[in-house]
Structures are given as structure tokens and as C-alpha cells.
């Protein structure tokens, strides 16, 4: 039965992540990069300056620019950076990392554009909260006739929260890492749902479900507070560990880069399979890159809309750093660590691949390296679960007219999905996530292309002041 379900999911995944969507994602990023004259490079230093500034240029909003970036990073830096990169390289070869970086580079302009539009078209909800996101810039920017597209986006946003980035993949990644550390041989098992699971999976799942239930009741302000403390710490700890691996194995880096580039263009495949190998690397690299940095799927604009600013461009610059930090820095380090240690072709799956890279690459006993990775993954995934609860609730607010009874009921469903996640197979979890992520991106990319003139005009107007 599970085999049949996985086969069906894989076919749907191949359909969603076929050539049209890959071209659409890359083309949108390239088009916006050209229209904005490479703003992600030209204004990168200014973006970092704004990120570290505590100043706000207006009273509208609920959280600071740094708080919004941390909320967005808390939702983007998750299992995608550790497990997603590993699954992409295992499935698509080392070349998947190349396409992940390419998509992120042009996707930075996409992230800038969507967060700029979120500020420009945000509104005040009936309960007094500042709200915004793709559903509002589709409706207000493209016109009432496009409200159906906004609703489609919101529906897929809820599904991504429940079935994609928000719950299954994160909790599954956490419990897999915990199990890999405490009971790798599954010595202590229990029979559940017709299958055997380690007690570590069950216990970790229950504990994390309780923590999630506690935090999401606090709403955005508590999520933002948690994110601002946890995200910088967990990102720094993970980056330091990855840098140590790269420094200790620096002689292997040139060979790894060559292998990544050759794999990206199918150079190692036989002549007839070169194109297929290249397409597989593109598909897995871009899909898992989108999973990780969320550029183009429309999630970050929901957090950006709550920022205390009246300048859409300013927040667009800060928000685009999420893609730089998440993929161009963290995912690249993960991918290089996996390739230079050779852990990707050892027949391992999911978190075990990155764990193997840390065990081989770090100068510590295997248990210590596995523990470091487990801690990073727990923090990464936990904050992603919190961030996506907020995102999906805003989508639900839009669909239901801010019906709080529905939202409260949804929170229990969300918590239930967190509880279920540990008992799903790794392949099913990631395939489902890829499918709903791709479907969520389509209406947002359409809106970004339609409203590119607004983005360019706002950008020119802002920088004309300097």
C-alpha cells in the first residue's frame, strides 16, 4: 500500500515539477534581476545595514525589520538546509547543489519583489492587526477580477503549512535525527500503526508536539520573540561547524566543485543520458532550494507585511537577505560538506547523509558530531514549525474573513499534523512537500510578473531620494 502511494506521489511530483515550473521559477528570477538591474548585488551592503538597524521609519506595523527577518528565517532555515540538501544530492547528484545556488541567486530578486509588494498592499484586519501577503497584492494590485487567484494561493498556503514545509517534514526530520543519535539500531521499538518505531521517535514526537502547542498560542509576537533569540544562535552554530569541516578538508574543495559542475550539466552521464541527468539535477536542486529559502512561494511577504515601516523598498532589501543567508550561505556549506566527505553515495537517506558528513568531517568522536547536528536540526525545524503556523493562519484568515473560530480549530489540526509527522516515511514526506510548494508558487509567480512594473517604480522612487 505504502509503495503504491509513494509511486502515485512521485508521478504527481514529476508533473508539478516538470519543465514549465522550473522555467517559470528561473525566468521570473532572471526577469526581475534584469528589471531591477541586479539589486541583490548592487544593494547587498545597504540591505545588511538596514538589517542591523533598530530604526523604524514609521509607526505602521507590529514588529521590527530584524524581527520580521528572523520570523522569516525561522520558517525558512529548517530541515531543508540539512535534510533537504542531502535528499537533493542523493536523488539528483552533486549537481543539484549548483542549481540550488543558481535558483537562489536570481531568487533573491524574487524575494525582494514579493516583500516590497507585501508592504505596499498590506491592510488592517478587523481585529486591528496589520496583515498582508500575496493574497492582498493579487487582489489589490491586480484587481478584484483576480481574487480567485488570491484564494487559490491561500488554499495552497494552508496545505503547505499542514502537509509541506510546516509540519510533516520538520517533525520527521527532528525525530529522525534524535533516533539516529540515541537509538540508531532501533534496539527499543514499539508497534504503532502497523509498523515498528523506536521509542525515541515516539517520545521526541510527543515532547515536541507539546512545545509547539504551547508556543503557537502566543501568536506572532511570541513567535517573533522566540525567533530573534534562537535563529541567530542556531545559524551561527551550524555555520561554524560547517566551516570547520571545510577548513579541515580544504584540499578536497576544488575536486568537489568540479564534481558539482560536471554533475550539474550531466557531464558524467553517458551521452544519451546527459540531458536526463541534467534535468534531474535541476529538478531536485531547484525544488529543494525553494523548499529551503521559499523565494517565490509567497511565504516571507506574510511576515514582512507586519513590519514597522512605511518604506516597501527598505523591507524588500532586508527580506531578500533571507535567501542569501539560507541558501547561498547555509545550504552551500551543507552541500559542500556532503560532497567533500563522500557521504551522499553511501546508500544513506535523509538526515543520515548529513550526519555522516559531520561525523567524517569534524574532529570529534562520531557521537559528538551527531549530537551537534541533532541540536542544530531540532532548533532549525522547531522554529520552522512555528513560523509556518503563522503563515498558514494568515492564509486561513483571508479565506474565512478572519473567522477566529476556524483559526482556533485549525491550530488543533496543525498540532495533530505535528504529532503524526514522525510516523511517515522520509520519501513520502519530501515528495508531498515538493508538490504543495510548487502549487503554492504558481499563483505568486504570476502576480510578481504582472506587478513587476510596480516593483520597479517603487524602487526608483525610493532611491531617487538619495
Segments the model singles out, each with a brief description of its role:
Residues 4-5, 36-40, 80-85, 161-174, ...:
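Transmembrane helix-loop junctions in multi-pass membrane proteins
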Residues 38-65, 87-89, 93-97, 109-145, ...:
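Flexible loop linkers connecting adjacent transmembrane helices
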Residues 58-91, 117-141, 152-155, 159, ...:
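Alpha-helical membrane segments and immediately flanking helix-loop junctions
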Residues 57-62, 94-102, 140-152, 186-194, ...:
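Membrane-interface alpha-helices at helix entry/exit sites of multi-pass transporters
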Residues 24-31, 36-48, 171-178, 199-249, ...:
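Membrane-interface loop-to-helix entry segments
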Amino acid at each position: 500500500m505504502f509503495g503504491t502511494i509513494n509511486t502515485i506521489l512521485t508521478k504527481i511530483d514529476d508533473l508539478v515539477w516538470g519543465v514549465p515550473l522550473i522555467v517559470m521559477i528561473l525566468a521570473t528570477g532572471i526577469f526581475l534581476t534584469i528589471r531591477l538591474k541586479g539589486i541583490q548585488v548592487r544593494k547587498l551592503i545597504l540591505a545588511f545595514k538596514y538589517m542591523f538597524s533598530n530604526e523604524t521609519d514609521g509607526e505602521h506595523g507590529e514588529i521590527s525589520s530584524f524581527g520580521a527577518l528572523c520570523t522569516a528565517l525561522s520558517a525558512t532555515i529548517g530541515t531543508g538546509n540539512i535534510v533537504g540538501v542531502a535528499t537533493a544530492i542523493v536523488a539528483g547528484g552533486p549537481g543539484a547543489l549548483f542549481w540550488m545556488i543558481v535558483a537562489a541567486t536570481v531568487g533573491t530578486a524574487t524575494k525582494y519583489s514579493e516583500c516590497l509588494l507585501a508592504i505596499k498592499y498590506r491592510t488592517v484586519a478587523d481585529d486591528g492587526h496589520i496583515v498582508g501577503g500575496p493574497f492582498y497584492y493579487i487582489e489589490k494590485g491586480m484587481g478584484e477580477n483576480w481574487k480567485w487567484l488570491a484564494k487559490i494561493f491561500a488554499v495552497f498556503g494552508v496545505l503547505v503549512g499542514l502537509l509541506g514545509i510546516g509540519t510533516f517534514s520538520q517533525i520527521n526530520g527532528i525525530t529522525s535525527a534524535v533516533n539516529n543519535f540515541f537509538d540508531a539500531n532501533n534496539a527499543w521499538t514499539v508497534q504503532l500503526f502497523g509498523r515498528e518505531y523506536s521509542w525515541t521517535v515516539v517520545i521526541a514526537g510527543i515532547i515536541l508536539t507539546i512545545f509547539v502547542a504551547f508556543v503557537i498560542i502566543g501568536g506572532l509576537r511570541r513567535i517573533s520573540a522566540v525567533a530573534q533569540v534562537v535563529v541567530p544562535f542556531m545559524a551561527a552554530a551550524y555555520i561554524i561547524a560547517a566551516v570547520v569541516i571545510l577548513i579541515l578538508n580544504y584540499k578536497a574543495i576544488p575536486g568537489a566543485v568540479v564534481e558539482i559542475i560536471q554533475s550539474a550539466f550531466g557531464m558524467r552521464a553517458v551521452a544519451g543520458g546527459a540531458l536526463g541527468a541534467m534535468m534531474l539535477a535541476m529538478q531536485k536542486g531547484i525544488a529543494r532550494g525553494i523548499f529551503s529559502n521559499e523565494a517565490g512561494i509567497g511565504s516571507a511577504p506574510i511576515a514582512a507585511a507586519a513590519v514597522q515601516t512605511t518604506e516597501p523598498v527598505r523591507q524588500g532589501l532586508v527580506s531578500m537577505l533571507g535567501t542569501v543567508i539560507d541558501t547561498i550561505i547555509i545550504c552551500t556549506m551543507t552541500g559542500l560538506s556532503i560532497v567533500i566527505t563522500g557521504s551522499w553515495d553511501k546508500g544513506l537517506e535523509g538526515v543520515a547523509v548529513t550526519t555522516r558528513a559531520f561525523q567524517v568531517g569534524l574532529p570529534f568522536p562520531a557521537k559528538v558530531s551527531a549530537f551537534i547536528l541533532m541540536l542544530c536540526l531540532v532548533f532549525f525545524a522547531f522554529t520552522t514549525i512555528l513560523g509556518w503556523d503563522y503563515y498558514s493562519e494568515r492564509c486561513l484568515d483571508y479565506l474565512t474573513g478572519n473567522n477566529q473560530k476556524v483559526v482556533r480549530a485549525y491550530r488543533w489540526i496543525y498540532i495533530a499534523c505535528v504529532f503524526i509527522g514522525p510516523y511517515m516515511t522520509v520519501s513520502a514526506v519530501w515528495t508531498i512537500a515538493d508538490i504543495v510548494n510548487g502549487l503554492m508558487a504558481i499563483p505568486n509567480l504570476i502576480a510578481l510578473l504582472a506587478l513587476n512594473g510596480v516593483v520597479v517604480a517603487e524602487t526608483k522612487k525610493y532611491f531617487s531620494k538619495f
